[in-house]
Amino acid sequence: MHHQQSSYGGGYPGQAYRQQQPNNAYGYGQPSPQPYGSHHNGYNSPQQNYGPPSGGHMYQQQSAYQNSYNQGGHGIPARPPDQPVSFGQGAPQEYAYRYSACTGTRKALLIGINYFNQKGQLRGCINDVKNMSTYLHENFGYPRENMVLLTDDQQNPKSQPTKANILRAMHWLVKDAKPNDSLFFHYSGHGGQTPDLDGDEDDGYDEVIYPVDFRQAGHIVDDEMHRIMVNPLQPGVRLTAIFDSCHSGSALDLPYIYSTQGILKEPNLAKEAGQGLLGVVSAYARGDMGSMVSTAVGFFKKATKGDEVYERNKQTKTSGADVIMWSGSKDDQTSQDAQIQGQATGAMSWAFISALRKNPQQSYVQLLNSIRDELSTKYTQKPQLSCSHPLGDLIDVPVLGSGFIWFWVLSIFQCQATK
């Protein structure tokens, strides 16, 4: 998530990316270990700090929800199409997205790391996991036995958020996922950046998360998380991911990032152009013609590289699965530990739940704006929305009108409500 605003700034200290495997290899075909069958093993029951949103448990009261939706003048929404739908918006032509009915298995992996007795100790990450697990169970029907909680206050060694345990749990989350399954990933802890080694980042840095034993085992880079949790998914599988961490804007390496207006973002060449022009003007004012030329050439190369990286990522990291990621900050921003209503919590995790409690009937872009509104009065971080495929018409639902399925309108958890 974060760092403490008062005593710990600037993000977590970066380390060179260690291209090492965990002590044990976790193949997809291996059975999941017993502790991942239930989160009760060595873990206290979650605190019920966040109650269900008004209207009760949506996964148990579908008819009641539809009645309230119809009162808004939207009519009875249709079901999503059963056939694959072409992406468009610059996505590779060979890909097609399949809508998920989300009637299958629900599984969740939630990781919260306070880094006890370490530099940069946090206070709210474990509370984030407790609050989120309760919210998922009470409002969207995620079974307790299908949740894995990794927090560093647990006695069971397999429930500690070590690098090996986190990687193993990531494999567990996506193992045997089938169309219409709903998977959920939540990380609250330190994040950072490290130099990009494979050329897939337009800013030259990979995003990383820090396990509790990162000093010994190293961090986990975004490329690896994408390979484990996104690549194996079939069309029709839903994965919702939340990263409450610093520098987390592209923590899953999803190629489609959306603005608060619902516009697909391109590489920020305008910003680069302004910086490049400023450098050229400064060099000209100094009479340094050599520097002026080198600055202009450097900008051109950087802008060209950014555009090439963006196009390459669309070709290699687009997915037919439905992967949606909400992150606590942009790649160049930090996220905050917060004290809200007497409880230490991650600002992003709190804002996410708070926004949905106030209005569970939001589109993607509405929820992104709602989360930002929750944070705007106290924090400078700007949450991001990124996807494995273009959202198209899914990004925005008008306040008035019909023809949009309620399956879409529920935004981040919409498919969990269709059980």
From Swiss-Prot:
Which source organism? Aspergillus oryzae (strain ATCC 42149 / RIB 40)
Active site as annotated = H190, C246
Cite the residue spans of the region called Disordered: 1-89
Q: Which GO terms describe its molecular function?
A: cysteine-type endopeptidase activity
Per the UniProt entry, the Enzyme Commission number(s) are 3.4.22.-
Bias (Low complexity): 59-71
**One Gene Ontology term, aspect cellular component:** cytoplasm
Which InterPro entries is this protein grouped with? Caspase-like_dom_sf, Metacaspase, Pept_C14_caspase
Which residue windows does the record flag with biased composition (Polar residues)? 41-51
Q: Which UniProt keywords apply?
A: Apoptosis, Hydrolase, Protease, Thiol protease, Zymogen
According to its UniProt entry, the protein's GO biological process terms are:
apoptotic process; proteolysis
Q: What class of enzyme is it?
A: hydrolase
Q: What does this protein do?
A: Involved in cell death (apoptosis).
Domain of life of the source: Eukaryota
Pfam short name (any one)? Peptidase_C14
Per the UniProt record, the lineage of the source organism begins with: Eukaryota, Fungi, Dikarya, Ascomycota, Pezizomycotina
**What PANTHER family does this protein map onto?**
METACASPASE-1, METACASPASE-4
Annotated protein name in UniProt: Metacaspase-1A
- Family under the similarity heading: Belongs to the peptidase C14B family.
